[in-house]
């Protein structure tokens, strides 16, 4: 997958530590096209000390890790976004005077993919209080839920899944969301997703429902919060929405810490 923040973060971090970086563009690489993942992993593992992979399938990054013989970092797959969790956990700690295991946060929106899954894992491992709010058809898979519940039993983490968004955000310190249509999905998905998620937009009213004047808004970006992009304008012209998963008022408010996070 293409990338702005993730690629830049890896490259800046590597160069700050004196490491060299080679970027293989999706269109220029033969991975999975003319050369198998297994073969590619064994070649790259002989040339590099580490590999960051950003793509669609979790199975691909796991196969790279199996055969490369060097550390492989998951820069994002459809299922997980672990490096973003380093940023999210740090950002929540920086913007709270509570220890991590006393922080409560909610994720609202489409909860089937990498951000909701990864936030569940983060909360379970660190003993945090996480609430996932989405229509039941957009909840994480049963396998993910069972996995994080088992981990949370060991750490004291608290996990709630609910369709009631007001219940989810009450008393939280942070409200997270993400885009409703992910990279690679067809335009036709927008209508269905908007119909399902219209009550899960992060608005000033939803922020107020936290009943916490210090509540912060988080989003891994990019966000559809106004009409200032081609996609944002198309959404406005097609569906009449100026901003999708979050309103401009919340995104640009003092409660928004998205640029610290991203």
From Swiss-Prot:
Might you name a Gene Ontology BP term for this protein? L-arginine biosynthetic process
Tell me the compartments it is located in: Cytoplasm
Its main localization is: cytoplasm
Q: Which residues form the signal peptide?
A: none
What domain of life does the native source organism fall in? Bacteria
Catalytic reaction equation(s): carbamoyl phosphate + L-ornithine = L-citrulline + phosphate + H(+)
Q: Which SUPFAM superfamilies match?
A: Aspartate/ornithine carbamoyltransferase (SSF53671)
Looking up InterPro entries in the UniProt record yields: Asp/Orn_carbamoyltranf_P-bd (IPR006132), Asp/Orn_carbamoylTrfase (IPR006130), Asp/Orn_carbamoylTrfase_sf (IPR036901), Asp_carbamoyltransf_Asp/Orn-bd (IPR006131), Orn/put_carbamltrans (IPR002292)
What's the short name of a Pfam family annotated to this entry?
OTCace
The protein's enzyme class:
transferase
Q: Which UniProt keywords apply?
A: Amino-acid biosynthesis, Arginine biosynthesis, Cytoplasm, Transferase
Query: Does the record bear Coiled coil in its keywords?
Result: no
From the record, what ranges are coiled-coil?
A: none
**EC code(s) of this entry:** 2.1.3.3
The family this protein is said to belong to: Belongs to the aspartate/ornithine carbamoyltransferase superfamily. OTCase family.
Known role? Reversibly catalyzes the transfer of the carbamoyl group from carbamoyl phosphate (CP) to the N(epsilon) atom of ornithine (ORN) to produce L-citrulline.
The name under which this protein is listed is Ornithine carbamoyltransferase
Q: Which gene encodes it?
A: argF
